[in-house]
Amino acid sequence: MEQKLGNLVKKNVVNSVFQGRSLLAEKDFTPMELEYLIDFALHLKALKKLGISHRYLEGKNIALLFEKTSTRTRSAFTTASIDLGAHPEFLGSNDIQLGKKESVEDTARVLGSMFDGIEFRGFKQSVVDDLARYSGVPVWNGLTDEWHPTQMLADFMTIKENFGHIKNINLSYMGDGRNNTANSLLITGSMLGANIRIVSPKELQPSEKTTELAKKFAEKSGSRFLITDNIDEGVSKTNVLYTDVWVSMGESDWEDRVKLLKPYQVNMETIRKTSTPDDQLIFMHCLPAFHDINTDYGHEIFEKYGIKEMEVTDEVFRSIYARQFEEAENRMHSIKAIMAATLGNLFIPHV
């Protein structure tokens, strides 16, 4: 009897949709699976607000690997782990030697023997891929130079909260169209049926490889995407104006980037160009944002280039359209959903 029960448990674990899987890029999951995770995140957010316990990771140990510094990702994974009953352990760039003094494979095998799940935030996509390949435990991509999948769950969760649906929503991303956020928005939106516009100068538009992948997903979902340097065309009748920092972590070409992207700043004129009613338009930003000179970076840019605001003006950042802090909070709830689904004591047979 015990043997039969054990076999049944093993069979169920194997057949559970999410159990043991890693989230390395959005394309690792089907559109229906992403929609399920978004709805699960909304459910977990409701439980959190009601003070209802949801400790699906009781007794689990989670390694948080950070080559790149972070406020939101670290805070979200830490609080999500604790709420779920797990113990998070932070390992910063001075604690891990990925590919330097120890190979990624060796590190993965060691961490996999001690931890039940691993989050990685860093530079190379190959590192998070290898952590998943060799650790034997679920691995979650907190950000790489190519993709930002945990951000996407929070972003599209925020969109669904505000509009009640994702399909046919128009989202215009303004800025560096080659960075991880732009890549992930284009792919995720195309998977989920949202119409994504990447509004960037020609020098900073997505790669052909990324657009070809988006095209395949868009054909299946019925969504439409647009890559353009024409701001008027890119923001017309949009529902979501989205932007990101002009220079990503690890980059240093501020002067060229400021010159290229200054026309693509999200300001009140951009809002007017959308011609979208106020109740059908929101602004989003994955943060941090340079909307004033109250930071060292902001002050430095002002001293060098004479601009007090970069990718978004302070007026828009503090306007009725702004949802960036709601979006930031949703990092915790959506990360909680992916951790619980892939590692928790849940059985999800299908979606």
UniProtKB/Swiss-Prot annotation:
One GO-annotated biological process of the protein: arginine catabolic process to ornithine
Amino acids binding carbamoyl phosphate: 70-73, 97, 121, 148-151, 286-287, 331
GO molecular function, one term: ornithine carbamoyltransferase activity
Keyword Ion transport: no
Domain of life: Bacteria
EC numbers: 2.1.3.3
Name of the top EC class for this enzyme: transferase
Positions bound to L-ornithine: 180, 244, 248-249
Assigned keywords, A-Z: Arginine metabolism, Cytoplasm, Transferase
UniProt KW Cytoplasm keyword: yes
Homology family: Belongs to the aspartate/ornithine carbamoyltransferase superfamily. OTCase family.
Stated name of the protein: Ornithine carbamoyltransferase, catabolic
Name of the encoding gene: arcB
